[in-house]
Regions:
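C-terminal motif of bacterial Sec signal peptides marking the signal peptidase cleavage site
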Residues: 22-24
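Sec/SRP-type N-terminal targeting helices
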Residues: 89-90, 106-107, 147-175, 225, ...
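A short glycine-centered flexible hinge/capping loop motif at secondary-structure junctions
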Residues: 217-221, 425-429, 466, 470
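Bacterial Sec-pathway N-terminal export signals of envelope proteins
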Residues: 26-101, 274-303, 354-355, 380-383, ...
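Small/polar, glycine/serine/threonine/aspartate-rich low-complexity segments that form flexible
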Residues: 53-54, 60-68, 74, 118-142, ...
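Periplasmic alpha-helical coiled-coil/stalk elements that build and connect Gram-negative outer-membrane
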Residues: 153, 169-284, 396, 400, ...
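Bacterial N-terminal signal peptides that target proteins for export
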Residues: 2-14
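Short terminal targeting/anchoring segments
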Residues: 223-225, 429-450
Length: 491
């Protein structure tokens, strides 16, 4: 008896040791964030330093970056976007779905319990008078559990969690994109308002010039061509104003769609526009890895793909499941269901191992590895594209700031030239063709200056978006610096 017990103990210990050894071989590779080529500083940062207004380092920490522009109307519209924008609503639903999938994967780690019951009353039709109907009741309580010996379920949970975090980042990206589009369309609309005001003033000036040429023609001291040229300038300016009304309506319709209402139910009255260009804290390139939602989402996709390798590898090992049940069946009275004499119980263990699959599992593992490498490449490209976007907007910010000073100077000179030539025309010193040329140049310079000012604002918006808009991946707080990814040969 002792020998049998000793033999059984040795067998049990060997089985446990083998299971532990196999469990150590199972599971996916340890995840390490892929390395990226992040420079210490931005290439165009020095070029932009003299042209970007200073801002405190925590200016964007709340994520309400649009408030940096100091426009109360924009602030109100941004609030409506966050509540009613349908792209954001879809991203919220996707995130909620991803969280539910995490809960579903995590539930597989625990046993499931089921309760079954049935009752039946039966008898014969047209039978003898001695036969009577009979009752039959059954009830059972069952439990089943698949222990996660090889880590497949844990890897599935890890993959689902990473996908949920990627979905969270996608939600942040949707908010950033929607409010960025709102701000861009809003300031473009305000720029159209400013151009309309400018054209109204220009039309008044052209009307006065037309009256002057008409009076001179009536007095016989000017040619009819002068009147026709003045009329052409006046009518063209009016046509330009009509075109700006169409442009403004287009921006207004875009804003309506962004805040989730039909264009027919939304209008934005004209208002004075202040071309404020806010300060944008730059930080260093490495912080972009945590502050840009698209980068964070791409990195989480890498983590999810890494977990898929573990799931694929777990198929090499046997599936183990445990079952237990207790219950009674075919009793005539309900109270007898709980009688010990009628109770049956059972315990079960099942093990299933694939013996031959013609390389299907190996193919799935190779597919998972390739999927991982693909996600790493997409992540690195996302990082590079993000760095490019920041550098582009830094260059644009510096260039446009320098251009504004020059354009302002050019506009002032063109205005002065227009006025001087008009005075000389009144004195009969120049032809009206010279006045027309000066008027066209002055109007072009004024409109170019206004357009450049809104370009500076939209460039600031693009730079804020490129920097992540103040968002930060919460799951990366305190994370270690990125380490080189494991080579494909060792995964």
């Amino acid at each position: 008896m002792n020998a049998l017990f000793s033999s059984t103990s040795r067998f049990s210990f060997s089985a446990l040791a083998l299971a532990a050894m196999l469990a150590g071989c199972a599971g996916g590779p340890r995840y390490e964030q892929p390395a990226t080529a992040a420079s210490a500083n931005w290439k165009e940062q020095k070029a932009a330093e003299g042209w970007l207004p200073a801002a405190p380092a925590d200016a964007l920490d709340r994520g309400e970056w649009w408030k940096l522009f100091g426009d109360a109307t924009l602030d109100g519209l941004a609030g409506r976007v966050q509540v009613s924008n349908q792209n954001i609503a879809a991203a919220v639903a996707n995130y909620t779905q991803a969280q539910a999938l995490v809960r579903g994967e995590r539930a597989a780690l625990f046993p499931s319990v089921s309760l079954d019951g049935s009752g039946k009353r039966s008898g014969t039709v047209g039978g003898s008078s001695t036969s009577s109907p009979s009752n039959s009741f059954s009830a059972s309580l069952g439990a089943s559990w698949t222990p996660d010996v090889w880590g497949r379920l844990r890897e599935a949970v890890s993959s689902a969690q990473a996908n949920a975090q990627a979905s969270e980042a996608d939600l942040a990206a949707a908010r950033l994109s929607a409010i960025g589009d709102l701000a861009t369309n809003y300031f473009s609309l305000r720029e159209a308002d400013a151009e309309i005001v400018l054209l109204d003033e220009t039309i008044q000036g052209y009307q006065r010039a037309f009256d002057i040429t008409s009076n001179r023609y009536a007095a016989g001291i000017a040619a009819q061509t002068d009147v026709l040229q003045a009329q052409t300038q006046l009518v063209n300016a009016k046509a330009e104003r009509v075109g700006l009304q169409r442009t403004r309506a287009t921006y207004e319709h875009a804003i309506a769609a962004l805040i989730g209402v039909a264009p027919a139910d939304f209008s934005l009255p004209a208002a004075q526009w202040t071309p404020t260009v806010p300060g944008v804290p730059l930080g260093v390139p490495s912080t972009l890895l945590q502050r840009r939602p698209d980068i964070a989402a791409a990195e989480r996709s890498v983590a999810a793909a890494n977990a898929q390798i573990g799931i694929a590898r777990a198929a090499y090992f046997p599936n183990i499941s445990l079952t237990a049940s207790v219950g009674s069946s075919n009793v005539s009275r309900v109270k007898d269901l709980f009688s010990s004499s009628n109770t049956l119980w059972g315990l079960g263990l099942s093990v299933a191992q694939v013996v031959f699959d013609a390389g299907a599992i190996a193919a799935n593992v190779d597919s998972a590895k390739a999927g991982y490498e693909s996600s790493v490449a997409r992540y690195r490209q996302t990082v590079l594209t993000a760095f490019q976007a920041v550098e582009d907007q830094l260059t644009a910010s510096a260039t446009l700031a320098q251009q504004e000073g020059l354009r302002r100077e050019a506009s002032a000179a063109a205005d002065k030239t227009e006025q001087q030539l008009l005075n000389r025309y009144r004195a009969g010193q120049v032809s009206y063709t010279d006045v027309v040329t000066a008027q066209a140049a002055a109007l072009s310079a004024r409109r170019t200056l206004v357009q450049l000012q809104v370009n500076r604002q939209t460039t600031a918006i693009a730079l804020i978006q490129a920097m992540g808009g103040g968002w930060q991946a919460g799951w990366m707080d305190g994370a270690a610096q990125a380490q080189p990814a494991t080579s494909p040969a060792t995964r």
